[in-house]
């Protein structure tokens, strides 16, 4: 076969061989073949390909006899990982104009250019499941997303954490007057927290993110909202240079290893990012400055973090809680009784901690 560019979100190496399949392939045969390690290059009808993915997903084991929330959580992650690995072996080919060569296929060229730029070779091969995710993301990016308290819409990019959970956003609306404050936003994502703070009176925001896609997304959103003059964003590990009156961070809240790029918004192995944020916070604050940490307690409810762990970290880093405000987590899964983690998620709360350095 001709050389192709392999695109995968989970750093899987390019397949050594692709096996051509078509509409005659049954889901049972497909499952056997992908479990054998084959990558199946689909040619035929787009809707049939989507139906095959759905049928494969339904054939995967989801049963769990977990006895604790943590066992349920780990079983759910393993099942998701297995589903991802299995379904990612159904792949499709795009030509040098990012045309999907299946009958009844939608136009995917814009969605592909938004994520990858121009084609690098004659053919691009991508898991169909990932391409469907990119199409959905392109639609969100086109339509935009309304956020409570924000004037204007957020247009999220593919691979950047979607601000569909409103609990942490609504906590920010509790903040007192921000007039004239210089703000750092660490791990900005779409930029949503920065824009809320600017619309509430902050004079400037310097935002950072470790992912280039988030930086591009936040920059474009600032432009759309007319906030480019007061908003700067750059790729950085944690803090921008200098000091700020207010440093805000909504870090990943589950201390487990991320499995792919998108996971990094939720999973923080051994709480490394959270610990480094708290350790570096005092030095990033101007005199009289405050840190704002927004964190869910799901890790405690799952047994991944002991009760009181966060307070110990504050003390270790020379920080004290000036005030805090909590709210019940509001997201689609909190009410889903079929979710194996329902017990934990229904009790989840998100807290905004206002932190100041302990007086020397």
Model-found features: residue ranges?
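SAM-dependent Rossmann-like transferase core, predominantly class I methyltransferases
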Residues: 107-182, 186-196, 345-347
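Class I S-adenosyl-L-methionine
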Residues: 310-358
């Amino acid at each position: 076969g001709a050389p192709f560019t392999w695109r995968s979100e989970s750093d899987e190496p390019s397949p050594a061989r692709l096996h051509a399949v078509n509409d005659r392939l049954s889901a049972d045969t497909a499952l056997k073949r992908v479990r054998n390690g084959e990558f199946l290059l689909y040619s035929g009808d787009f809707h049939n390909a989507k139906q095959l993915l759905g049928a494969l997903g339904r054939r995967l084991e989801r049963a769990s006899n977990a006895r604790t929330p943590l066992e349920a959580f780990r079983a759910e992650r393993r099942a998701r990982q297995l589903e991802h690995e299995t379904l990612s072996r159904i792949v499709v080919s795009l030509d040098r104009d990012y045309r999907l060569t299946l009958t009844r296929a939608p136009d995917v060229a814009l969605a592909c250019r938004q994520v990858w730029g121009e084609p690098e070779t004659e053919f691009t091969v991508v898991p169909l499941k990932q391409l469907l995710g990119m199409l959905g993301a392109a639609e969100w990016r086109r339509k935009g997303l309304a956020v409570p308290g924000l004037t204007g819409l957020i247009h999220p990019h593919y691979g950047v954490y979607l601000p569909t959970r409103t609990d942490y956003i609504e906590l920010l609306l509790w903040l007192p007057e921000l007039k004239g404050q210089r703000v750092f936003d660490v791990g900005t994502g779409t930029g949503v927290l920065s824009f809320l703070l600017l619309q509430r009176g902050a004079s400037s925001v310097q935002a950072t993110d470790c992912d280039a896609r988030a930086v591009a997304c936040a920059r474009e959103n600032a432009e759309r909202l007319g906030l480019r003059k007061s908003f700067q964003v750059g790729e950085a590990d944690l803090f921008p240079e200098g000091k700020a009156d207010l440093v805000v961070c909504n870090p990943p809240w589950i201390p487990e290893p991320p499995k792919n790029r998108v996971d990094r918004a939720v999973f923080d192995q051994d709480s490394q990012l959270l610990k480094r944020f708290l350790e570096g916070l005092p030095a990033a604050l101007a005199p009289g400055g405050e840190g704002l940490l927004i964190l869910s307690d799901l890790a405690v409810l799952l047994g991944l973090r002991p009760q009181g762990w966060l307070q110990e970290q504050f003390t270790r880093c020379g920080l004290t809680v000036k005030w805090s405000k909590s709210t019940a987590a509001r997201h689609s899964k909190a009410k889903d009784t079929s979710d194996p983690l329902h017990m934990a998620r229904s009790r989840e709360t998100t807290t905004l901690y206002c932190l100041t350095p302990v007086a020397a």
